[in-house]
Regions:
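Bacterial Sec-dependent N-terminal signal peptides
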Residues: 1-36
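Active-site-proximal alpha-helical segments within enzyme catalytic domains
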Residues: 78, 82-88, 120-123, 244-248, ...
Length: 478
């Protein structure tokens, strides 16, 4: 029989149809199996009262690998930082810097007296004097001192003035819980931030109660402690001006304990620090009230690169950094920064990428507000489209902490055994746990969102369940 006879051609075409059918059937079987894993996970008795949102997509093709209630908006906690940071890097790029401007009013006479004020304009840099910035915490103040000495200034007749007007009020979201704002993770967001807008309090057990063993920064605040040992941490903080009163219990196995509390006026702390440094340098600040004079700029002090700020933010889940970046977004279209305008920028931006704004209820940039809600599909869209960005996609992926090694996911899936690289931003608060990020293999990359509200198991048990889910789903992906 000729190779090109009608019968041979029919046989060849029939074979092709069978192979195509088997290929399609095989693919459908894999997809169904993956979806079945998700469905079985969601049917766990611990999730009977839960709200669950899951969406896993192939970044390259955009195909949805598996999903569950992907359009239901639920509380994301800190995974909402992905929306804040991805939008910022796409609008401003990783090499962008914020600037704090230093100058003075009036003139400097031949005796070295500045007849005016020293003026610092906050530029929205959350890393100024931060423990987590690339330069040491005193670098900004040291540069001011050096500039004053190079101008032969021996005294400043006026005040040290900090202009904090670039960001609109409120500094603290009205949606945040009152009990959160005393802690460093609930500190206010100002155009002029300094030393992470927080104080560090070190406590030592004396056999009956806890003594204050140290305060950083020192000699700036008064702390009164009435703390004893208990089953768990249960601490109440009251603050008035620079005086903190702390009461409650500390876990009984801890003889030393460290607390980080928010400060309401970072500008006041900075002025006190700078005045002290001026005094050491032999420069007197007289604090006289003077009239209005023209202003002369000395220098613009740059922040770390935005990309470095985002990496630090995502690995450490820093709320202050996130809130500052949210306000930075609004400056792309407005003269002053505000959270509300920043959120409006986010909504409009992602509408261009088929992210349905009806699935986003956003009230801050950090995720501290329990009113925040977002769908797994919306969050996945942000992940997917950002990873596809030719200019910043790979950079953004690397800003997320590596599961099993870094940040809040340092212990999550530590022994998962997945062949690829799993980078996840976690989010957690009372009755809320979530992960969002990427799984990357040499051949493919997948965007992953898993959010669960109101589970009835322990958080440790929930982490184990999610770990098992991701292991089953992702181990099938090469």
């Amino acid at each position: 029989m000729s190779l090109y006879s009608p019968l041979a051609i029919f046989a060849t075409n029939a074979t092709k149809r069978i192979l195509l059918f088997l290929l399609i059937f095989s693919s459908l079987t894999v997809i169904a199996t993956t979806q079945q894993i998700i469905d079985k996970f969601a049917s766990d008795p611990a999730f009977i009262p839960s709200s669950i949102g899951i969406c896993i997509t192939d970044v390259k093709t955009g195909e949805t690998i598996a999903s569950y209630n992907e359009r239901q908006a639920i509380i994301p906690a800190s995974t909402i930082k992905i929306i804040t940071t991805a939008t910022a890097l796409r609008l401003y790029r990783p090499s962008f810097c914020l600037h704090t401007t230093v100058g003075h009013t009036g003139t400097i006479d031949e005796t070295g007296t500045l007849h005016g004020d020293l003026v610092i304009h906050g530029g929205g840099d959350p890393s100024l004097g931060s423990t987590y910035r690339s330069r040491h915490t005193e670098d900004f103040i040291d540069q001011i001192i050096q500039r004053a000495l190079s101008n032969h200034i021996k005294s400043i007749e006026g005040h040290i003035v900090v202009d904090d007007s670039l960001f609109d009020e409120p500094a603290i979201s009205p949606k945040w819980m009152v009990e959160d704002i005393a802690w460093d993770y609930g500190t206010g967001c100002h155009a002029f931030s300094y030393k992470d807008n927080r104080i560090e309090i070190n406590l030592r057990y004396n056999g009956k109660s806890y003594d204050v063993a140290g305060i950083n920064p020192p000699n700036r605040f008064v702390v009164e402690a009435s703390l004893t040992k208990g089953e768990k941490e249960n601490i109440t903080v009251q603050c008035e001006n620079n005086r903190y009163t702390i009461s409650g219990t500390i876990p009984k196995r801890k003889d030393r304990y460290r607390l980080y509390l928010s400060i309401a006026r970072p500008d006041s702390l900075f002025i006190t620090d700078l005045q002290e440094k001026f005094q050491t340098a032999g420069i007197e600040v007289r604090n006289s009230n003077l009239g209005q004079f023209p202003e002369t700029t000395w220098f613009h002090y740059p922040s770390d690169y935005l990309g470095d700020i985002v990496h630090s933010l995502n690995v450490r889940s820093d709320n202050l950094y996130a809130e500052s970046i949210l306000r930075l977004l609004s400056l792309s279209a407005h003269e002053k920064g505000s959270a509300e305008k920043g959120i409006d920028i986010i909504r409009k931006y992602w509408q261009n990428y088929e992210a349905d704004s009806l699935e986003l209820f956003m009230y801050d940039g950090s995720g501290l507000a329990r009113n925040n809600k977002v769908s797994a599909k919306y969050l996945n869209c942000v992940l997917k489209e950002t990873a596809r960005d030719a200019l910043i996609g790979e950079y953004f992926v690397q800003t997320l902490p590596l599961a099993g090694k870094e940040g809040s996911v340092a212990t999550f899936m530590k022994h998962g055994g997945l062949p690829g690289e799993l980078r996840l931003k976690s989010g957690s608060m009372s009755d809320v746990h979530a992960y969002a990020g990427y799984y990357t293999t040499p051949q493919n990359r997948y965007a992953i969102v898993v959010m669960i509200n109101n589970y009835t198991c322990t958080r440790a048990q929930l982490k184990q369940k999610i770990s098992a889910l991701l292991t089953q789903v992702l181990s099938k992906k090469e």
